[in-house]
Regions:
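Short gly/ser/thr-rich secondary-structure transition/capping motifs
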Residues: 17-25, 89, 147-149
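A secondary-structure boundary/capping signal
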Residues: 26, 41, 63-64, 81, ...
Length: 209
């Protein structure tokens, strides 16, 4: 059976090396084994495939549930390791799926902003906090630079310009099933977002300067 993930990664890397000035930094920071959450800034459709390309292991993703209503897209996304998520509301099915993925020792990528930005880091959403604390797994921050100039599907197929993916150091939070108050959630979220912000230029950091 064809491994769609490997095929897509091969094509994407070829495209990046052909059309763009592509750079990867800190790839050795990625643990080879064990449950892992990648957290990254999000500017364009190509961003998830960048995480997949640089990772030495398969990465699971989430995508807005509306995309899965189109059957060909749903088949492709599921084959590529994506799971639907309902935005702007608490999606318990997502949390159950994510915890199951991590309990199996797999890797998951989340974009804490919840949607694409214009290149400047948006305020993070709290969902990542509850998952990080509930599981206590390793977290890898990733900073992506240059993809805001590659919007739409064309930016996935034919990315151009200088694109830099910088991988930071592993960090994690103490595992706990206790309820978190607002101040604790905000403090944990700020730490996650600041770890991402440190990997991108100051002009892209928004409120996390």
């Amino acid at each position: 059976m064809l491994d769609l993930n490997k095929i897509c990664n091969f094509i994407q890397l070829k495209s990046l090396n052909t059309f763009a000035d592509f750079h990867i930094k800190g790839i050795n920071n990625i643990p080879i084994n064990g449950p892992l959450i990648f957290v990254a800034n999000h500017q364009a459709y190509v961003d998830p495939s960048l995480i997949s390309v640089i990772s030495p292991r398969k990465v699971n993703f989430v995508a807005k549930s509306e995309v899965f209503k189109f059957l060909p897209a749903a088949i492709f996304l599921k084959s590529y390791g994506a799971h639907p998520i309902k935005r702007n509301k608490l999606d318990l099915n997502f949390f159950r799926w994510a915890i199951k993925i991590l309990n199996k020792g797999e890797a998951l990528c989340l974009f804490p902003e919840g949607t694409r930005s214009d290149g400047v880091l948006k305020r993070g959403l709290p969902g990542i906090v509850h998952l990080a604390v509930r599981t206590g797994v390793n977290i890898i921050p990733v900073g992506i630079e240059g993809t805001n100039k590659n919007p739409g599907a064309s930016g996935v197929l034919f990315p151009t310009g200088k694109i830099i993916v910088k991988v930071g150091k592993v960090f994690k939070f103490e595992k706990s099933n206790e309820s978190l108050n607002r101040d604790t959630v905000d403090a944990i979220l700020d730490k996650i977002m600041n770890n991402i912000a440190e990997l991108i230029p100051s002009g892209m950091r928004g409120i996390y300067k």
